[in-house]
Regions:
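Conserved C-terminal helix/tail region of periplasmic/extracytoplasmic solute-binding proteins
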Residues: 307-335
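Secondary-structure end/capping motifs
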Residues: 241-316
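A bilobed periplasmic-binding-protein/Venus flytrap-type ligand-binding module shared by bacterial periplasmic
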Residues: 55-57, 121-131, 229-246, 298
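Short, low-complexity disordered leader/linker segments with a strong preference
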Residues: 1-39
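Pocket-lining segment of extracytoplasmic ligand-binding domains
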Residues: 97-98, 179-272
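Short, glycine-/small- and polar/acidic-enriched structural segments
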Residues: 35-165, 172-174, 191-197, 213
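Short, solvent-exposed loop/beta-turn-alpha elements that line the ligand-binding surface or hinge
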Residues: 61-66, 218-227, 294-303
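Solvent-exposed, polar/charged alpha-helical surfaces in well-ordered, non-transmembrane soluble domains
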Residues: 51-59, 78, 82, 86, ...
Length: 335
């Protein structure tokens, strides 16, 4: 009897050990497999649009195991759009209105990730011109670039909100490039201009008699009941975002930290901006950073002001937002 009991106990032990081994093997099999290697491709633009990404470009970013990041700095938006549409680029910093255009063009496959700069437009004027507000432009002539695009729509909106008719109450001489407006101011051929950064810093440094007369972001908020002028955004490939939520989360956290770093330490930020190929002059970059309104605004917080901005642009030219104001699906990453 005693031998029989021992045999039974031995069998039980064997069964128990077998069960434990089976559980260990099953547990091991259920562990997450290592992430498939992937390269996250990110596009941005030279100038203010790309400034907030400079630290990430120079120092790199950790997006997790087997994930590498490849940044491209382009001189113009049209150098990035085809790659964003095709899905080759998973993320891209672009003018806000172009984000809307791409959302409509891809039938919702390009969506909002964040807002990364507010307005970078300013009215600059000779200190003798007597301009300190939009209303002061009545009867004046200004030089500007960006005809047929966002700068023109922003200027016209603010003139009209201040009771001025473009081309009637204010003469606007459009030139092809921002640099042409700077040249005219420097030569004394013009005394008032609308310019974006860093061209504002370029002319005010070169000609101390030229001052910032109107911050167009502040004028926009005053004219639109507090709505922000959100001029550039980070857009994201929707399919990729849904398949890689943790990678996207890490990117956004790193992006916000990079933006904070540039704003908190402009001198170091300027070095990174030059090293990243976003600007060529560190001194100019450092002076321009405070006026570039570099921000990180998550989708949920950006939606109301951005929707109002798109609505205003569409009122001037529907093509500016791709034919129609983006619907709720554009803001899906904020849900």
């Amino acid at each position: 009897m005693e031998k029989m009991i021992k045999k039974m106990n031995a069998k039980k032990m064997i069964v128990l050990v077998g069960l434990m081994m089976g559980m260990i093997l099953a547990f091991t099999a259920c562990q997450a497999k290592p992430a498939e290697p992937q390269t996250v491709k990110v596009g941005t633009l030279a100038g203010p649009t790309g400034m907030g990404m400079a630290e990430m470009i120079v120092n790199g970013v950790d997006l997790g195991e087997n994930v590498t990041t490849e940044f491209t700095v382009a001189g113009a938006p049209d150098q990035l759009t085809a790659s964003v549409i095709s899905g080759e680029f998973q993320l891209a910093a672009l003018p806000s209105n172009l984000g809307a255009v791409l959302f409509n063009k891809t039938e919702g496959q390009v969506v909002l990730g964040s807002v990364n700069t507010l307005g970078v437009l300013y009215i600059v004027a000779d200190e003798t011109a007597g301009v300190t507000s939009i209303a002061d432009l009545k009867g004046k002539t200004i030089v500007a670039s960006g005809q047929g695009s966002t700068p023109e729509y922003v200027l016209n909106y603010l003139l009209e909100k201040n009771g001025l008719t473009p081309g009637v109450d204010v003469t606007i001489n459009y030139v092809a490039e921002h640099s042409e407006a700077v040249t005219q101011l420097a030569a004394g051929q013009a005394t008032i201009a609308m310019l974006p950064e860093p061209f504002v810093t370029t002319i005010t440094t070169k000609k101390p008699n030229i001052k910032i007369a109107v911050d167009m972001s502040e004028a926009w908020e005053a004219a639109s009941n507090g709505s922000q002028l959100q001029m550039t955004t980070l857009v994201v490939n929707k399919e990729w975002a849904e398949a890689n939520p943790e990678v996207l989360k890490k990117f956004m956290e790193a992006y916000e930290a990079s933006i904070d770093s540039v704003n908190e330490n402009p001198a170091e930020g300027a070095k990174n901006i030059v090293a990243a190929g976003i600007m060529t002059d560190a001194t100019l970059a450092e002076k321009a950073i405070p006026n570039c309104n570099i921000v990180f605004i998550p989708v949920k917080e950006a939606q109301q002001s951005l929707n109002e901005y798109y609505t205003i642009l569409a009122g001037f030219e529907p093509k500016a937002v791709g034919g129609k104001v983006p619907g709720e699906e554009f803001y899906v990453l904020g849900k």
